[in-house]
Amino acid sequence: MDGFAVVVGAGSFRVEGGVRFPHRWTAEGVSVGAEFTGAHLLHLAAAGCVLNDLYREAAGLGVRLDGVRVTASGGFDTESWASTGIAYGIELDSPASAEQQAALIEQVDRVAEIPRAIRAGAPVERR
């Protein structure tokens, strides 16, 4: 699943040359590296949600995050243009222990709203 790759970063992992957006969890904002296609935007939604939820859940657990980078990619069936899946990776810059970081990542994988919605599927209708 290496197609349609995107990257979002915050803190010490901001994306050089990426587009910057304000972010409620970091003063410097979030940077995004992605092309503007439907596939990239779908993957960006998942990656951006995971990044946000890492900061949200870390605050609740008392885990300091100095930087977060989330990458996501996936494929599409060229006959139906249905997603063939999305894979994402996480890098953390944190003084927290490896165990605390792993627990944070597991928690976010359970609660991140966009990945959960994609996993569950949802009807999309034109109005």
PLM region descriptions:
Residues 1-45, 52-127:
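Extended beta-strand/beta-hairpin segments
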